């Protein structure tokens, strides 16, 4: 699996709190339907990136299983603690020759919204980045749109990708 696809899938799974799912602490199952996810990062602090995701329980379960496989394959350390509505995730993973250390804190508002703040360091730099910080906000907006399949992600450019299909490759 190439590094760009792993980075995209990891970012997508992180957006809904599913990375590192091999651990005992489980986040709430998010409400099925259409989710709007807004991400900002230190690389582009003045830009917000908006995607929508059509989620159901089966997509979340498959993403957790995929996340476990990626974590086992790429991470030497991962830890997830759930305290009330707050989940803290730390991990040390390899991206090719680069060691990535991450820490994310997610705060859930029931199963209909969440806020995440994350930091990652890269040694040596990954794609010219030594450090990145991001903020992700997700909220349930209603049922998936007609014609959407569970797992569909629509990017801000209008491109639709299906997470289930990407995880099978």
Label the predicted regions.
Residues 1-12:
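Bacterial N-terminal signal peptides that target proteins for export
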Residues 14-16:
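Low-complexity, intrinsically disordered segments with a bias for serine/threonine
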Residues 18-24:
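Sec/Tat signal peptide C-region and signal peptidase I cleavage site
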Residues 25-169:
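Subset-of-secretome marker
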